[in-house]
């Protein structure tokens, strides 16, 4: 599937873009939303002009991408979700995940309805917790995980045109993950759009969006750390 890389993005973002467009329409056309009438060009969406459709599609994709930010953190720091890692340090893992969830839920509880507060608290708390766990560990586990993964995948890469058991296995779990990503993005869009629709004002909504995507920015730090460690400790030739 490496030669059809675009299929990954089509699977991952097409449905999310459609749901994102619906979310944008909901947020701007719902009288109870803080974004009601924010986009004047959508007031007469029933005309379905090319400009309106293009604008909604573009905003839908942007909303989809923002909503999917927690998935990037999960993907980058997934080494800390392995059973062997959790079993080795259960208390540290629990503290790094539960404390941010409790704090995030408590803060959101003041401004959002309970269902939205709990949903956002769990997503954002897990998001921050994994990023913090990776930083406190100085990315050691992530470095080991990616090195082991690269070593395991190397034979399959050299035989990429062959239907080897390893290639079939990798293709299978990638398909599963990408379809899972698509549905997880939809779930995150529902949570985020509900939270934004029930937010007290646009200022809080902006803060919520910043907090929602902030831990995902740590992926740049993780990538840079892996690059630096590869330069210092390259794979044997």
Question: For the regions a protein language model found, what residue spans apply to each?
Answer:
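N-terminal first transmembrane alpha-helix
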Residues: 1-112, 204-216, 222, 226-231
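Detector for Asparagine
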Residues: 3, 37, 52, 137, ...
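Juxtamembrane/interfacial segments around transmembrane helices
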Residues: 59-70, 141-158, 226-237
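Alpha-helical membrane-embedding segments
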Residues: 71-79, 151-174, 178, 185
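Transmembrane alpha-helical segments of multi-pass membrane proteins
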Residues: 83-106, 120-129, 170-184
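Membrane-proximal helix-loop-helix units in multi-pass membrane proteins
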Residues: 97-162
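C-terminal transmembrane-bundle signature of multipass membrane proteins
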Residues: 168-237
């Amino acid at each position: 599937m490496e030669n059809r890389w675009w299929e990954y993005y089509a699977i991952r973002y097409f449905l999310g873009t459609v749901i994102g467009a619906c979310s944008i329409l909901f947020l701007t056309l719902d009288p109870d939303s803080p974004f009601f009438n924010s986009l004047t060009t959508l007031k007469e969406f029933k005309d379905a002009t090319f400009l309106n459709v293009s604008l909604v599609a573009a905003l839908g994709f942007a909303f989809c991408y923002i909503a999917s930010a927690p998935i990037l953190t999960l993907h980058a720091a997934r080494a800390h979700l392995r059973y062997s890692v959790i079993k080795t340090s259960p208390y540290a893992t629990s503290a790094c995940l539960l404390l941010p969830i409790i704090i995030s839920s408590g803060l959101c509880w003041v401004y959002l309805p309970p269902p939205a507060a709990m949903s956002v608290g769990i997503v954002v708390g897990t998001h921050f917790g994994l990023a913090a766990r990776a930083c406190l560990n100085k990315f050691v586990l992530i470095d080991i995980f990616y090195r082991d993964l690269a070593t395991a995948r190397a034979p399959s890469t050299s035989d990429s045109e062959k239907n080897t058991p390893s290639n079939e296995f990798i293709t299978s779990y990638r398909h599963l993950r990408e379809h899972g990503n698509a549905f997880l993005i939809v779930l995150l869009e529902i949570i985020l759009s509900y939270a934004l629709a029930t937010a007290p004002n646009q200022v809080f909504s902006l803060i919520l969006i910043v907090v929602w995507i902030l831990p995902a920015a740590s992926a740049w730090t993780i990538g840079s750390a892996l690059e630096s460690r590869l330069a210092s400790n390259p794979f044997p030739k």
